[in-house]
Amino acid sequence: MGLTKREEKILNSIIIPSENDPNKPEFPPDNPKFPATPTYQIKIPDFSNVWLKDESVNPTGTHKDRMAWEMVVTYKQFLLAKKGGAIKKLPKLSILSSGSAALAIQNQLKKYNLPDLNVLMDISTKKEKIDYLRKIGCKIFLIKLGNKILNWEDILNFTKNKDGFDVTSNEAYDLTVRFYDWMSYEIINSDADYIFVPFGTGQLYENILNIIKKELNYKSKDPRFKGNYEILKKTSVLGATTINPKSKAEKLYAPFLPFANYSKQWIKYYRFTGITGKMSSVYNLKEEFLEKAMDIARKQSINCEPSGISGLALLLQMKNKIPKNSKILIVNTGKTIMDI
């Protein structure tokens, strides 16, 4: 069938400078640079060398903008397939989201005149958030989410998109080394002894560890890696999550999500084979430390919300187990306009 004139124009507008050349980065699409977001030192009581990776400067305010760009890249592949006659029409995408990923993806789809996003949300989601997403073009589907893990088929069925693709799970995409690969290199290039990162869907956490594994195990090295291999071998990556359904870090509590392939056995294997540091794991947060982290963030004008700054909360919770003079990187995944 080929492409319409409109689709041909969209195809030509999606520019991908390179897959992994640090001198030809792909994100953010309007002004690509590597690193794409800043890392700067912050003051934390009792610690002397703490740095913040700040994703709040992204287009919609969170690290999900990186995932959103990859959706545009995916649509370029769809367009090329349609141009070659492999498919007859562009598929729609569906996602299970608390809001930030849906906002970021729809923002990019709208910018490139691509099909609007189908979004599955919990029926308890704030009306203001639902209204905002609808306003920018998302098609919202509300259900009561329980503890049952939803797979990609469930999500497509609930969003009435049986011929489309679910981008929540990792079954159709290589999420663990694709959505956040550039970001992961920016993170490990810091040569930190300890990296603290929010663990919601698990995609970012797993991506970081898989990039570390790739760098330590593969003979061919990625040109984006500028760090120290000896430090990387010992770097511990600590994920912050919660089992509290009433936590202010609401994006970290989602028992129904099709998580990335995180398991204690998997991370134990990485530790035992020398791929990651001894403290690499996912830890449950105590709510009191979220309050302390937010207080520190406010005093230093860090743009964040509780889920995004949960890595700092975990550091405060574990402060007696972390050497005070070690280099520490806190990943702030940011805050959207809907988190105000």
How would you describe each model-predicted region?
Residues 1-340:
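PLP-dependent amino-acid enzyme catalytic core
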